């Protein structure tokens, strides 16, 4: 809906949002895994959270400037990168918290909870944009700001994560 309202063609959407994003997700999932191994789960989560918020600001820029395939390509690459990285970081974090004896059940519950917020927000985003009088730029800025409480909470539990992460 966003891409169409901004003025991108179906061909642009398919090329950049679908095809390019697929490759970016594969490549950066591997890179995200390497970064989490090298720097730890806490840093991986923190960097992913900040990067995801920043990627939403690129969507706000698209909403302000109008259709530009080069900006769309950059935005899709950055968004795919941050999405892949954050998924890897979240999977590592959830796996870290699971007890081996109950790992399947615990992982399923925590994974479901980790996407519940995103699903609820995504399903109501149209109503939010309508209440903002179609201001997609403001919507994406608000979604970037909404990350701040999660990052503050993550920062407050960093010592616990590092303690559990250390063998």
Regions found by a protein language model. Name each.
Residues 84-99:
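Intracellular juxtamembrane helix-capping segments at the cytosolic ends
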Residues 1-15:
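Short amphipathic helix-loop junctions that connect adjacent transmembrane helices
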Residues 10-11, 100-110:
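Loop-to-transmembrane helix entry/capping segments in MFS-fold secondary transporters
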Residues 50-67:
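C-terminal ends and interior cores of transmembrane alpha-helices
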């Amino acid at each position: 809906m966003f891409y169409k309202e901004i003025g991108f063609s179906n061909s642009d959407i398919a090329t950049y949002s679908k095809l390019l994003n697929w490759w970016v997700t594969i490549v950066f999932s591997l890179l995200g895994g390497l970064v989490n191994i090298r720097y730890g789960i806490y840093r991986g989560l923190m960097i992913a959270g900040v990067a995801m918020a920043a990627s939403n600001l690129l969507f706000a820029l698209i909403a302000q400037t109008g259709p530009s395939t080069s900006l769309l390509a950059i935005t899709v690459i950055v968004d795919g990168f941050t999405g892949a990285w954050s998924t890897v970081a979240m999977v590592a974090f959830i796996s870290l918290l699971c007890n081996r004896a109950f790992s399947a059940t615990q992982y399923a519950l925590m994974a479901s909870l980790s996407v519940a917020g995103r699903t609820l927000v995504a399903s109501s985003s149209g109503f939010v944009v309508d209440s903002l009088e179609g201001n997609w730029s403001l919507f994406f800025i608000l979604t970037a700001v909404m990350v701040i409480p999660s990052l503050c909470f993550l920062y407050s539990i960093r010592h616990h994560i590092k303690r559990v992460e250390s063998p």
